[in-house]
């Protein structure tokens, strides 16, 4: 038998083996729908999630979560396509990270005019407001997000963990897990440590099961 015949025979055997073994079958075409989570996406508790600022390629993924509320901690305003997506899916965006004419018009109910540097860390008042939204199960399923899903989101989730009774070492470890190669910010960790968790107003009739 020639080398050519041997090669053809071997090829036929390989095809037969592939047909009989599902693990060897090649995918003929890519999936029709690409499901891509936002940067640094991670579940926090049941129906509570965290991530970086979502983009258009993440919308199919977000649809699967059936979100009711997005807690927006990013210092910049959302893109128009994201606002349209949220409106089409009846998702309420709560603006906590930015306080300006845009956010006041949308959701931020306040009678005060506040000037905020977009590069500043969150202050105690904004953390308190964020946590009071999180501890209300009527807002669920809920996504907490900021620009990269690191420091602002990490601050709020860190204070939430303290509210849950976590020790500071565990809180710090979780925060740094999302900060990447640059590591955590000492000012963020100090803010988490010093935050007055007793200032958070919790309605016992609306508290999530994992906090009871």
Curated annotation (Swiss-Prot):
Compartments (UniProt record): Cytoplasm
Gene Ontology process terms (BP): cellular response to oxidative stress
Classification via Pfam families: Y_phosphatase2
Enzyme class, UniProt record, top EC level: hydrolase
InterPro entries recorded: PFA-DSPs, Prot-tyrosine_phosphatase-like, Siw14-like, TYR_PHOSPHATASE_DUAL_dom
Chain positions covered by the region annotation Disordered: 1-27
Keyword Glycosyltransferase found: no
SUPFAM superfamilies, sorted: (Phosphotyrosine protein) phosphatases II
GO molecular function: protein tyrosine phosphatase activity
Enzyme Commission numbers on file: 3.1.3.48
Keywords on record: Cytoplasm, Hydrolase, Protein phosphatase, Stress response
One GO cellular component term noted in the UniProt record for this chain: cytoplasm
Domain of life: Eukaryota
Residue ranges, compositional bias (Basic and acidic residues): 12-22
Annotated catalysed reactions: O-phospho-L-tyrosyl-[protein] + H2O = L-tyrosyl-[protein] + phosphate
Family per similarity comment: Belongs to the protein-tyrosine phosphatase family.
Protein name: Putative tyrosine-protein phosphatase OCA1
Organism of this sequence: Scheffersomyces stipitis (strain ATCC 58785 / CBS 6054 / NBRC 10063 / NRRL Y-11545) (Yeast)
Source species taxonomy: Eukaryota, Fungi, Dikarya, Ascomycota, Saccharomycotina
């Amino acid at each position: 038998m020639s080398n050519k015949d041997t090669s053809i025979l071997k090829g036929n055997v390989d095809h037969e083996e592939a047909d009989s073994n599902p693990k060897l079958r090649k995918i003929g075409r890519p999936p029709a729908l690409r499901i891509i989570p936002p940067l640094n996406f991670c579940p926090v508790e049941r129906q509570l999630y965290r991530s970086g600022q979502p983009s258009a390629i993440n919308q199919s993924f977000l649809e699967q979560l059936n979100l009711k509320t997005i807690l927006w901690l990013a210092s910049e305003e959302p893109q128009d396509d994201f606002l349209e997506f949220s409106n089409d899916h009846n998702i309420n965006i709560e603006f906590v990270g930015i306080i300006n004419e845009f956010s006041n018009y949308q959701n931020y109910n306040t009678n005060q005019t506040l000037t905020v540097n977009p590069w500043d860390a969150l202050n105690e008042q904004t953390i308190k407001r964020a946590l009071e939204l999180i501890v209300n199960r009527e807002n669920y399923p809920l996504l907490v997000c900021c620009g990269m899903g690191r420091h602002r989101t990490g601050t709020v989730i860190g204070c939430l963990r303290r509210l849950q009774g976590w020790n500071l070492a565990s809180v710090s470890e979780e925060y740094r897990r999302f900060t990447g190669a640059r590591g955590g910010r000492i000012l963020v960790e100090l803010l988490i440590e010093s935050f007055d968790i007793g200032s958070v107003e919790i309605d016992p009739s609306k508290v999530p099961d994992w906090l009871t």
